[in-house]
Amino acid sequence: MATQIARYVAPGNNLPGWHSAEQAWAQTQAQLAWYKAMEDAGEMIMIKDKEGLDKHVAQWMNNVPAEKKPVGFILSLEGADSLISLQHLEIAYEYGLRAVGPAHYGPGRYVNGTDASGKMNSNGLALLKKMEELNIALDATHLCDDAFWQAMDYFKGNVWASHNNCRALVNHNRQFSDNKKKKLI
């Protein structure tokens, strides 16, 4: 996985981030430009579908030394705050985005994340619906507990958690309870 991340925070919020979705979008586009530069240099290759994955795996099975092979990646967005509108999700899909984690830390434009609570707002539900239509996977990693359960009931596409620990081992709302892990499995 390769990540784009640029969070929006309302003015006056102490969390780090951009004060407009447009600024956050621009930051993700700069990150995308870096990934494209790495592709142009032959260092990386974006995997957008099963055909691309199969081709990449076959390339890694040949006898060329590993240091001469590009690293394959699936593009993910951590925190959807940079998506100015659902049209921007469509644009991102066209350039290769295949997974979205709608939340990050605190309150978000679509859903609340770590150290926050509350269900998804109407924009968050519309985001999930559009992700389903585009076959974009849902990364449930930073969803607050309320939003996690709501998303699991609402979203019918592929779901995963990219980077979590067990709440039984690390007692913090950022981590997944046993019930949340069971729901994913």
Where are these regions (language model features)?
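N-terminal hydrophobic targeting/anchoring segments and the immediately downstream early-domain regions
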Residues: 1-117, 122, 171-185
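Active-site core of metal-dependent hydrolases
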Residues: 102-183
